[in-house]
């Protein structure tokens, strides 16, 4: 009865991107571009092998990074099928709570809300300390760019 630990193994893993990860993916001249692309390729490879993994970016992070999906300068990153996590009422309330408790930026607070809503989380970030703060004790995998 109920869910045992083995039943959760099939649940989806999400890779969340922070502002610099989004910018690094988009700009081949960015010093962290190759590292960011290599992590994105791992996710694409896992999808191809039918392993449940997705890459996502909270809307507030996308805005902070200046990512306009309609701009041709973002064509490469658009091909990676990175999902947007909307700042809907539920996420907005959760993000406001994270921001009030931790005093981080709005974008980092939205990342914290996304972390709280997901089961297995990897965060690709330039600031591992901030991600540990916004995770508020939840176990996450942090990959530093």
Annotate each PLM feature:
Residues 1-12, 117-145:
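Acidic, PIN/NYN-like endoribonuclease modules and their adjacent C-terminal/linker elements
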Residues 50-55, 81-83, 117-122:
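Short active-site oxyanion
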Residues 24-29, 62-63, 99-103:
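Short, flexible loop segments at the rims of nucleotide/cofactor-binding pockets, characterized by
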Residues 61, 81-102:
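Acidic catalytic patch
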Residues 1-55, 66-79:
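Short, well-structured N-terminal submotif of metal-dependent ribonuclease cores
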Residues 105-122:
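Acidic, metal-associated active-site segment
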Residues 57, 86, 106, 125-126:
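Short beta-strand scaffold positions
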Residues 21, 61, 91, 110-111, ...:
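Alpha-helix capping/helix-boundary segments
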């Amino acid at each position: 009865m109920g869910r045992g630990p083995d039943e959760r193994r099939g649940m989806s893993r999400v890779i969340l991107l922070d502002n610099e990860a989004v910018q690094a993916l988009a700009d081949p001249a960015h010093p962290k571009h190759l590292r960011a692309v290599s992590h994105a390729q791992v996710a694409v490879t896992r999808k191809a092998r039918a392993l449940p993994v997705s890459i996502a970016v909270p809307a507030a992070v996308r805005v902070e990074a200046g990512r306009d999906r309609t701009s041709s300068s973002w064509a490469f990153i658009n091909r990676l099928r990175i999902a947007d996590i909307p700042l809907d009422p539920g996420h907005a309330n959760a993000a406001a709570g994270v921001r009030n408790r931790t005093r981080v930026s709005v974008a980092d607070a939205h990342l914290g809300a996304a972390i709280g809503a997901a089961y297995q989380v990897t965060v690709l970030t330039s600031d591992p300390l901030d991600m540990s703060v916004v995770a508020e004790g939840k176990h996450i995998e942090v990959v530093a760019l």
